[in-house]
Amino acid sequence: MANADFMHRWFEEVWNKKSEAAIDEMLAPGAIGHGLQDPDGGDKIIGPESFKRLHRQFVAAYPDIHIEVLDTFVDGDKVGARCRVTGTHTGDALGMAPTNGRVDFTGMLVVRLDNERIVEAWNQFDFMTMYSQLGVLSLNV
């Protein structure tokens, strides 16, 4: 049975404390991450090293990134979290020069756990709002 505390720990250790050791501990070898792309190519994240490449780019772009878990749910071996992401885009990463813009957007992560490690993840974050807040995407249609 999965545990909602896992999600709080994932976001606190991996994102708020920026711990790569936590990535190695909490993400299984061969874990598949849907909804995110490996910066080195590929339409998904596969394994800890692939995730670390993306994590490093995000942390470089948003050194003060903070993710707050708003809600969690558990369904068998799956745990989900609705989150709020805040930060300041001060780093040159993710394909754009720093804008010094603040972002505040939400998203959801659902993970499947095996032996207290993520083996599969589904990411649904509102990156359109993030890009709009940075002024690089207009949502006026």
Regions found by a protein language model. Name each.
Residues 1-141:
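C-terminal and inter-domain tail/linker signature
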